[in-house]
Amino acid sequence: MVISDYFEIERAYAKLNLYLDVLSKRPDGYHNITGLFQTIDLHDELEISQIDKRGEVRIETNIEIQGTNLIEKAFRTVEKFYNVGFGIKVRLKKNIPMGSGLGGGSSDAAAVLRFLGRKLKISIKDLLILAAEVGSDVPFLIVGGTAIVEGRGEKVTFLNPISDYRVDLFCPTISVSTKFAYQMIHESTYAKKPDFALKLYEAYLKRDHNQIKALSYNVFQEIMTSKYPQIQDALDKAQRCNPIVAMMTGSGSCIFAVQADKGKYRFIEDVFQHL
């Protein structure tokens, strides 16, 4: 097999759910959500190159990939709609913890879609449609930055970026299944306040720390902290840092603490500003 010496580097950025609620369960088995999503500068790094063998996906990584391989799923999804006359080799350096709610696997898939989009001249609009076929977080992570996300994740409204905030992460060494998390919640736990995501965004822009704390919400947090003492311990540790707000991202297990002027990671603009 001939492998090109030429590769492109893609960064797959982690995401935070600054707000996350479930509005209803859909007939197709998915859930309608509403959320305020934000990328931070923690990222996986992918070296992606074309290989001659059509349809082959080769992945080399520093850790074992668990569950569905979203990198391969991204490639197969593009194959269904486009004439992809090559395979790909991906060297993946994982920095985003798996099963943490930080969207690492989805962001890796989005990085592969961006690569294929350039090679096959696929528009961003069409990439977003393909991304929705791959996974619920993938459309947002094609672009990243700051966005209101609705539907099952396919409806993304990109917003002017929230800037000048930093965040620390407190990630217990447990992995939470998204499928399991959705099985644990029920309609009585839904906040059903779809306007709160936009109100929270406005509070971040105004740097209104009291409103940020009051409006921040994750529908999974109460259930997951009661189910997993390690997540509650991480939340307690984060709150001792006196942040603007500390909360869980996604369905867990990672806790983030938002700070005004300190913290290891920072909020970033869309991914195209950081390639």
Swiss-Prot record:
GO MF annotation, one: 4-(cytidine 5'-diphospho)-2-C-methyl-D-erythritol kinase activity
E.C. number(s) listed in UniProt: 2.7.1.148
GO BP:
isopentenyl diphosphate biosynthetic process, methylerythritol 4-phosphate pathway; terpenoid biosynthetic process
Q: What keywords were assigned to this record?
A: ATP-binding, Isoprene biosynthesis, Kinase, Nucleotide-binding, Transferase
Residues annotated as the enzyme's active site: 15, 137
Q: Which enzyme class?
A: transferase
Pathway given for this chain reads:
Isoprenoid biosynthesis; isopentenyl diphosphate biosynthesis via DXP pathway; isopentenyl diphosphate from 1-deoxy-D-xylulose 5-phosphate: step 3/6
Q: Does the keyword Kinase apply?
A: yes
Keyword check for Nucleotide-binding: yes
Q: Which Pfam families match?
A: GHMP_kinases_C, GHMP_kinases_N
Q: Which domain of life is it from?
A: Bacteria
Q: Which InterPro entries match?
A: GHMP_kinase_C_dom (IPR013750), GHMP_kinase_C_sf (IPR036554), GHMP_kinase_N_dom (IPR006204), IspE (IPR004424), Ribosomal_Su5_D2-typ_SF (IPR020568), Ribsml_uS5_D2-typ_fold_subgr (IPR014721)
Q: Which reaction does it catalyse?
A: 4-CDP-2-C-methyl-D-erythritol + ATP = 4-CDP-2-C-methyl-D-erythritol 2-phosphate + ADP + H(+)
Q: Which residues are ATP-binding?
A: 97-107
Family the UniProt entry places it in? Belongs to the GHMP kinase family. IspE subfamily.
Function of this protein? Catalyzes the phosphorylation of the position 2 hydroxy group of 4-diphosphocytidyl-2C-methyl-D-erythritol.
- The protein's name: 4-diphosphocytidyl-2-C-methyl-D-erythritol kinase
Record organism: Pseudothermotoga lettingae (strain ATCC BAA-301 / DSM 14385 / NBRC 107922 / TMO) (Thermotoga lettingae)
The taxonomy runs: Bacteria, Thermotogati, Thermotogota, Thermotogae, Thermotogales
Q: Which gene encodes it?
A: ispE
